Structures are given as C-alpha cells and as structure tokens.
Amino acid sequence: MTNSPVKIGINPISWSNDDLPSLGGETPLSTALSEGKAIGYRGFELNGKFPKTPEGVRAVLAEYGLELVSGWYSSLLAHRSVEEEIEAIAPHCRLLAENGAKVLVYGEVAGSIQGRRIALGERPRFYTDEAWKSYGDKLTRLARFTQSQGLRLAYHHHMGAYVQAPEDIDRAMAATGEEVGLLFDAGHCYLGGGDPLAVLRKHLARVCHVHCKDVRAGVVKLSRNEQWSFPECIVNGTFTVPGDGDIDFEAILATLLTAGYRGWLVVEAEQDPAVAPSYAYAKKGFATLNSLLARLAPQHASA
C-alpha cells in the first residue's frame, strides 16, 4: 500500500557488489532499478554506481518512480575525533535528507577486515570498559549531529568489524544514548554467532532499520570450520534472500510488527549473480516478505 508505514526495499548488491567487482561489477545501475521496480520494490539503498549529488540521485530514482531508502556511510570514528567525523559525514547526510531518507546506514570501518581475505576471528575489538565508553560517547555525539540533519543513525553490526557478535551489540547499545539506533541485520547476526530473533527482541526498542539477509546454515557451519574471511563467505554462498535460507523471517516480521515498527524492510543479500541470478532472487526475496506481510498485517502488503 502506498501510505504503509512498512515498506519493502532492496540494496543493489543483489546485482552488483561494490567491494567485489567480480560479482556483477559489469551490471549497470539501470538494470537493478528497472528490475527492482518491475518486481514491486518501493525503494533502493545506494551503491557506488549512484550519482554523488542530491540532485543526481533524485533524478535517477524519479526516472523509475522509486524512493531512496538510505545509504551506507563508512565511518572511521573509532580512530578519529567526532569533529573530524562530522565534517566527513555532513555531505552524505545532505544527500540522504534531501532525498527523503529518514535513517543513515552507519558502518564502522576503522580497523575493519570485512573487505580483506583474513579470517573473521582477526577482526578489531574493544578490549576494555574504558574503550567501549569512549567509543559510545563519541558515537552518541555523532548521532546527535545526524539527528539534527533529520536522520537517525542506524548502526550496522557487521562481520569483520568492532561490532560483530551479539555481545558486541549489547555493549554498543549499552554504551550509547537513545539517539543511536540499531540496524538489525538477520544474516550478520546469525553468522556472528547470535540467535536473530533473540537479539531482535533484546534490542527491539533501538531498531530503526532492518536488513533482511538470510543464510544457508550448512554453509555458515563450513565457514566457521574453515575460518573463512568475509569475502570468502560471500563467494561461497553463505548469504541469500529471505525464503531461500534458514532464518525464520515470519517470527522476525511478527516481532517487528507487534512492536509497531515503522520503516523499511530491505532485501540485502550479497551473493554471486552468476550462481544466484539477480532478478530471480530479488523476486523471491520480495515475494517472501510481501506474502508474510499479507498474512501478518495485510494493510502493509503490496497488492
């Protein structure tokens, strides 16, 4: 429904992976946008192929009748000052806010190994209470700035980064103020060692954005046994779209809807389009979420 407070969007990573150009790097943005629109998605998150100005993004999305969901921001806050980060993030805030986005996808990439072929166990960590407190204080201050720009900071817990495991999410939420929202990503939660539903219920009050990434449990087990890097997890098929993996998205959506969640459900599942064809898998992800919405809350589903 057009005015529904819950909308289904998608990330172009289903067609083209910015970090691994061998996975669909040749696919133009126009293909993703036209196919996503045809499937029924209401909006897209940004990727590296979008224009870099508010006006450019607006024009591209308008051509397809799509909304801007949000866009990833690579932060180095763990290694630099709040003032430096505010200066760096301001243009991204402007681009998002001027195109109607309400949340900013925040990724902490300081020290991250997410793009490197290094075992995930070698990721960066905060080892002391003081380190967590310092980081949390800085993050809260940065979130107040994004809030002043009309955007809720949505912290993306992510493999290969400081906040990866369920206990990291606990520490991050405890160390920050309510200004810092949580981007709940079911796939990263599972691969990071968590029970997605339990983590969601624990931090439900802070969730302001949702990435609907499914996993293939057998591949997850193999990734742990073989100590894969994050890129190896991707190319070997760890992730997939809702309805094609082992995460219970019905329980996740029911929990969100019961709590009155208002925002986007974003299909964001990086895999090799040569193995998992982009259109077919994007369609399956949409159909899964839309059918769940139709059953759980018919007013939110697309006709």
Where are these regions (language model features)?
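Acidic/histidine-rich catalytic cores of soluble enzymes
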Residues: F44, G136-D246, L296-A303
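Active-site acidic/histidine proton-transfer and metal-coordination neighborhood
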Residues: V82-F184
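Active-site mouth loops of central-metabolism enzymes
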Residues: S14-T27, L76-E85, P124-A131, T240-G243
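Conserved, mostly hydrophobic/aromatic
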Residues: I10, G36, F44, L61, ...
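Short, flexible, mixed-charge acidic loops at enzyme active sites
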Residues: L23-T27, A110-G121, V219-E232
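Acidic (Asp/Glu)-rich catalytic clusters
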Residues: T2-P5, L33-A38, P51-S70, E87-A101, ...
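Structural preference for beta-strand elements that scaffold enzyme active sites
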Residues: P5-G9, G43, E67-S70, K102-V105, ...
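Active-site beta-loop-alpha junctions enriched in small/polar residues
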Residues: I13-W15, N47-K49, Y73-L77, V109-G111, ...
